[in-house]
Amino acid sequence: MRVASVLASVAVLQLFSALAFAATDASAPDVAALLKRLDEQEQRIKSLEERLALQQRKPAATGGASVSTETSNPASPASVNPTPGTAAIAVAPAKAGPQGFAIQSPDGANVLRFRANLAFDGHWFSDQSTPATADTWLFRKVRPYIEGTLDNTYDFRLMPDFAGGKAIIVDAYVAARIAPQFVVQVGKFKGPVGLERLQPDQYNRFVELGLPSSLVPNRDEGAQLGGDLFGGIVGYAVGYFNGVTDGASTDAAGTPDQDNDGKKDWEGRLFLQPFITTDRAYLRGLGFGAGGTYVDITGSAANALLPAYRTPGQQIFFSYRSGATATYADGRRERWAPQLYYYVGPFGVLAEYVQSSQQVSRQVSASVRRSGQIDNSGWQTSFSYFLTGERELYNGLTPHSTFEPGKPGIGAWELVARYHELRIDPAAFAGGIESFSDPAVSARSARAFGVGLNWYLNQNIKWMLDFERTRFEGGAPADANRADENAFLTRFQLVF
């Protein structure tokens, strides 16, 4: 220790001083007295060393807790040469990178990350039927959030959204990773059903999700048990949730983020990646499975608990009858969603089918009440290909280069294409004026073809440009077809 070395040096100097004094002064003490004096000096040094060791074990600044001297900059002068006589103060490592800004404890067991998801969109239409007001710029997502881990076990996230001039809670949950096979999650988060819906937002290949994603739940409140078995070959999740209508989140309910019907949804998903551990690269990217939900609910004309469906350009093309004689949910709601993806090299494909069945009723008059079951379905197949050779993945991307003005590198460029459709059960339009949906307003089906170009400037910034052409069956007066929708959609997205 540096202080001990200084004390030893002082003792040596004192010894030489005493010997010099004895050699030059006739009245100097005898040898026995000199040895006694040296022994006293040695005891004094030993006492000082013990006090120094005690001070380093119990720094006053931490109330006796052990403190690490590791800092985020180990080569800094303060960490290499602390001020003598002061206790070392530990600095938790701070990091900044593609995954956001993070602060963590010296042992890495506790981490707090500051992140954000910002999406600024442009919607432009070249058809003659979409209202001119639909041509617009808008913030689709404004989501600063925090997430982290406690004790290497408990993950958490709190994510609000300020887009659209309002504030909502998008995610708010805690997940306990008891083991890879057992993860308990509680709070508000995405339900375990739709494949595209479960994909992290920053890895969606199109500006808007496909039509079948309109049939699966978005974010719900509840508790879920899930995990990975056999090294990730089998993934499962089962949960008990408040329940939401097709494509919706609990913040869109009549009373936001509260149970609006008193009934609970069972939701579950089983997903297999049978070759994830194999050496065959052309098989590792194959995954398939199915998700589903079940509940028995009863709404009312005032609280119908039924969805409306939108086009890729976010225009409503189907809704149930509303008003005093509105159609409302009245019985079982079941969803079934088989799904598949395959990624190899720069190529990827994602496909899914969804069927949503809902028993409904409508009090047409005081004496007439109609009931029935509506089975709506949708499917999609989407393709993606990296022109710059990056590896396609369901939930990740690392560009081979980044785009910085004045430097080499063009980022990652990706071509995407998809076909998707949503079909409404003909039973929704049966019965004339007593039907559950008005055929002069709502379409019987929507079929869309989309192409797009994505530019990943780096891992955090993405620019997307899509064109979606949607054709309809029905949806206009006199049983005519609603005019086609031609939508140009763009998004500037920042995620860190």
Residue ranges and their predicted role:
Residues A8-A18:
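Bacterial N-terminal signal peptides
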Residues E42, E49, E196, E208, ...:
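Acidic-residue sensor for enzyme active/binding pockets
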Residues Q56, K166-I168, G247-S249, V360, ...:
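Extracytoplasmic/secreted cell-surface and envelope-processing proteins
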Residues T130, Y282-R284, G292, S300-F496:
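Outer-membrane beta-barrel pore domains
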